[in-house]
Every structure is written in structure tokens, then in C-alpha cells.
Amino acid sequence: MTILFILCCGIGRADASTLDARQNLSFGTLIPVANSGSVIVSTAGAVNTGGNVTVAPSGTSYYQGKVRFTPTLLNVFTVRAADSSIVLNNTSSGGGSVTVDNFTVNPSSLNITVLGAVDINIGGRMTFSASSKSGTYTGSVRIEVSSLLAGTLSVNLPVTLTLWDSLKMNETTPLFFGVLEISSGASVVQLNAQTGQRSVVSGSGNVVLSTGQASTAGRFKIKGQPNTSVSVALPSSVVLTGNKGGTMTLDNFNGYPSSTQLSLDSSGDGNLNVGANLNIGASQLSGTYNGTYSVTVNY
């Protein structure tokens, strides 16, 4: 009697494909100009702020996320973000959180006919609210590459965002030249931004600096992102109008500590003083003169 044994065996190779995070999905450094809103970073690295934020002139740039897939099998693979939405938490002392969703991947399908590394770009939408304080926000989204033959590979891609405080400015003291006694000649009175004191720079015989009311420099308090610099813009001239008629011009505006730039301290606070020159005409009418001037600060 002959017994025939048939032995069957499968010979295969374990899939050694890899999926690695190469570049964070970064929403950059943003300054909210609204209480809430969304910002989109595309898979091409373009940003759409929707008018809800401005991009800070310094700090982290925005860019799309990248993962690298290195296959060892010739196959068709599907790419997706396994998380529909994630929460980024503020790692700074301010607290708060933001949400990131609407993840996009490019390419979303891979037909591997030649082995080699493939980079996959990741985009998404970040939504902030009034409770999203300044600071650095971090989290991660899970990216998957899968096929029926190879199974599923996944990697956690870091997602980052930095929010700065928006700038706020308040006038605490008005720019005031005090009381001036004038004669028939023209003169120019300068108000020093640092000291708030007046001096006659032209036509000294035509004006007396009365001590009845103290002059004051314009004083402003600025609040913003700690340890940053802001630009300062002062007007070239403004016109004051008298209650009995007549006008006078203010020009040569100057700021202290600077007319062009201001550094905010570790608490985000800064102080700016403003002075100017008052041009008094030869036949200037007496009275009380008032006007407004603008001060602009920007990151």
C-alpha cells in the first residue's frame, strides 16, 4: 500500500512599509482681529485667514503637514486622516483650546507601480473662539495609509499654532498746550513728548507761556504680545479749531521713547508719550482750540 502525502506551504514576506511624519501641520503665528473665526491651511501650504486674523510679522510660519510613505509592496493604497477633528491645547499659562477639522490629504490614493518614497501633504481648518488665549497650541492628527494586501499603517502628525494678543491702545492723558498769551506776531510753541513741558522755538516775543494750567504730553498705554516690538505712526499735521473762530496747525509730532517703534515688556505693556509743535498765526483769534489726532501702532 502506498500512501501519498501532499504538503502545502505558503512562502511570503512580511510587509516592511513605513510611514513617518516629516513636517508638522502649522497654522503659524496669528493675531486674532475677531472674537472667533477659522483659518485654513491647504495641502499646498497656502493660508486663508478669512479676515479673522492677521499673520504675525515674526514667529512661526504656516505650512502644510507632510508624511512620507515608503512602500515595499506594489499595490493601491488609500490615504486618509483617521481623526475627523482634534483639539489643540494651549501649553502656555493662558489656557484655552482650538479645534482643527476638515483635514485634507494629497494624494488621497497611491497606485504604487515602482517602489520608492512618496510624500503626502496634509491640510486642515483651525477654529478659535474668544476663550482661545495667547500662547502655543499643540496636538496631533492620525494619518493612515492602507490597502487590502498590506493592511494599515498610521502615524501621528503634530499640529501646531501660536496665537498673539491683539494690540489695544488707550489714551490716558490728552495732549494739552495749556494757556498761552499771544500778541500780534506769529510764533511756534513746542511741547516736549518726554517731559510735557513747553518752549517757544519761534517768535519768542509774541507769546507768553502762562502757568495758569500745566501743559501735558499726550500719553497712551499699549497692551499686546509680551516681549515684542510694535511700529508707531504719528500724523504729519492736524488742524485745531477755535470756539470763537480761527484755526491753528499742529505739526512736527514726536513720540517718546520713540516716534517709530515701541518695545512691549514681559507683561505686554508699553507706554507712549506724544508731543508736537503749535503754530500760532500773526492775527490769531483768542479762544479755546480743539482737535483730534491719530496714533497708529502695529506689530
Where are these regions (language model features)?
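Surface-exposed binding patches on compact interaction domains or structured appendages
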Residues: T72-N111, P226, A233-S259
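C-terminal segment of classical bacterial N-terminal signal peptides
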Residues: F5-A14
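N-terminal small/polar-rich segments of proteins
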Residues: A14-R80, N111-V232, Q261-Y299
